[in-house]
Regions:
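Rhodanese-like catalytic fold shared by cysteine-dependent sulfurtransferases
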Residues: 1-22, 28-60, 69-107
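Short, surface-exposed ligand- or partner-binding patches at beta-edge/loop junctions that are enriched
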Residues: 64
Length: 107
């Protein structure tokens, strides 16, 4: 199944729309302490199978991690279990920091 790969600019544009998408951060806690996108829901990748029922099914979900690999795997899993509007932040929070918010720490 194909998952939409959104650039940081596309994600920024999506955040201005209604309904606003849910930003799902699947990084580890120590990574989240370094930086995160405002308003994100944090569920580490390894807990997604146990907690995906906490996610809304009536708004788009944009999944992100550090570079976009873990989040792509989570997005594929969410689509597999029935979520219909799931996308991946291409390049992860690293790309976001480089292209949208240069004040965000890089790691």
């Amino acid at each position: 199944m194909s998952i939409a790969q959104l650039t940081p600019q596309q994600v920024q544009d999506c955040l201005k729309k209604q309904p606003a998408p849910l930003l799902l951060d699947v990084r580890e806690e120590d990574e989240v302490r370094l930086c995160a996108l405002p308003g994100s829901l944090h569920i580490p990748m390894n807990l997604i199978p146990l907690r995906h029922n906490e996610l809304p099914d009536d708004v788009p979900i944009i999944v992100y991690c550090h570079h976009g690999i873990r989040s792509l795997n989570v997005a594929r899993y969410l689509a597999h279990v029935g979520f219909e509007n799931v996308a991946n932040l291409q390049g992860g929070i690293d790309a976001w920091a480089r292209q949208i918010d240069p004040s965000m720490p890089l790691y």
